[in-house]
């Protein structure tokens, strides 16, 4: 792709066209160096399913669809809050939410396949949001989750795993088992 700053737009456009039945642009990208991009791998997997899932080409449309199917009387949990844009959006429907983050950025380097996001990327400069109905637990998951889950917690309606790193996501998932039941919706943002 000539201009890397337009890479994600081109990938998304090709995926939308593919989803609408025009496979030419997507197939061309699959024959290029962006074949290993995490989005391309995700799109390829989704398009290979016998019954492709409903796709939402916007984080906000996706969250709207999740909220329509969720139990609003339960809280949501979010692992990886950063600047709390998703958290604030979810609070439009839920009465309470728990957010977990260091607010100082990634705790370790993150290899994204085309480069590395350095430890400290996605920092909120230590600024913890103040949102009515929200409770924020500050620190690494390894340090905070054993303490947080040492007490009974309400079953989750939605859990948004947006920690980016596999190590952080698997830690959060492992500790969250007590708040997951058959009605809990799990969201896995890239990791």
Predicted stretch roles:
Residues 8-16:
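"A position-specific structural signal for the A-helix of alpha-solenoid helical repeats
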Residues 4-6:
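Short helix-capping/linker turns of helical repeat alpha-solenoids
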Residues 1-2, 23-35:
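Alpha-helical repeat scaffolds
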Residues 48-61:
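Conserved SAM-binding loop and adjacent beta-strand
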Residues 27-31, 50-53, 141:
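Short acidic/polar alpha-helix capping motifs at helix-coil junctions
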Residues 37-39, 43, 64, 68-191:
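S-adenosylmethionine/decaboxylated-SAM
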């Amino acid at each position: 792709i000539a201009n890397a700053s337009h890479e994600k737009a081109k990938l998304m456009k090709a995926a939308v066209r593919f989803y609408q039945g025009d496979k030419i642009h997507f197939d061309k990208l699959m024959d290029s160096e962006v074949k290993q991009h995490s989005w391309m791998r995700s799109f390829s997997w989704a398009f290979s399913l016998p019954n492709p899932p409903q796709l939402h080409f916007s984080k906000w449309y996706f969250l709207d669809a999740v909220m329509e199917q969720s139990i609003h009387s339960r809280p949501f949990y979010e692992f990886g809050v950063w600047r709390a844009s998703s958290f604030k959006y979810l609070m439009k429907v839920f009465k309470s939410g728990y957010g977990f983050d260091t607010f100082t950025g990634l705790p370790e380097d993150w290899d994204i396949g085309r480069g590395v996001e350095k430890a400290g990327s996605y920092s909120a400069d230590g600024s913890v949001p103040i949102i009515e109905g929200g409770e924020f637990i500050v620190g690494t998951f390894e340090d905070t989750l054993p303490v947080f889950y040492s007490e009974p917690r309400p079953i989750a309606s939605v859990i948004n795993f947006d920690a980016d790193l596999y190590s952080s996501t698997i830690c959060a998932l492992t500790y969250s088992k007590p708040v997951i039941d058959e009605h809990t919706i799990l969201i896995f943002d890239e990791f």
